[in-house]
Amino acid sequence: YFYAIEYIVNRFLDKTKYERHNKYLQELYIPNPPTDIQQQIVTEIEQVVNAAALLTQQIKQKENEIENLLSSIQYGDDSLKTIAPFATKSIKYFEIESETYITTDNMLQNKLGIVPFEGEANISSITEYKKDDILISNIRPYLKKIWFADKDGGCSKDVLVLRSADTNKYLPKYIFYMLRRDVFFDYVMEGKKGIKMPRGNKEDILKYRIPIPSIDEQMRIVSQIEALESEITKARNLIENTASEKQTILDKYL
């Protein structure tokens, strides 16, 4: 009955109230189709669940391929202070489109980018960012919030903006991939300030070193990773559709 209960919860319960309380559950009607229909529901939904599990494994495999590629790079290194120092130009909030505003709140955990900002920010001064900049949340670095800017905009002061010092020598996307690694966030956490709300130490962050191959090699590496990223994105999109696929099956039989 798990899938039937899931169907009821998702379709009929008011999510604004705590309706999983016993008094509501006692009044719930749970469909009880014939056994053969129940078995068909289970079979079809398990196919969806198993497909999602396989996609999750594929994502992990592709992520490991990316990490193995990046960890195998053996070239002379340099510090972020030289490669991609902080961009710190302050601008006014009214100078940007509100949907381009980035805060720690609309940055997603585990390196998943951002979601659009909604509403109006109660703030005047923000930090300008440009397309191809790298934005990193400096609050609770262990949440691993990082984004490669695909547009111009502004961000809160709790978001660090790193910009390639010379795009002819340091490819922005290459820098981004080198910083989007667990090893970088582990490094930031080692030098953190504060306990309850830890922040990265900006001076230490600028000391972080990454290997710098030729610009042609950087482009080749980025191209390889982007191909893997494309496969990961496709798999994630399919996983996101899992809930609606399960609901379609339940709607068909219940």
Name these PLM-found stretches.
Residues 32-93, 107, 207, 211-222, ...:
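Non-catalytic DNA-recognition/assembly elements of restriction-modification systems
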Residues 136-137:
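A generic structural signal for residues embedded in beta-strands
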Residues 140:
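Short glycine-/small-residue-rich Rossmann-like dinucleotide-binding loops
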Residues 143-149:
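Short, Lys/Arg- and Gly-enriched loop/turn segments at beta-strand edges
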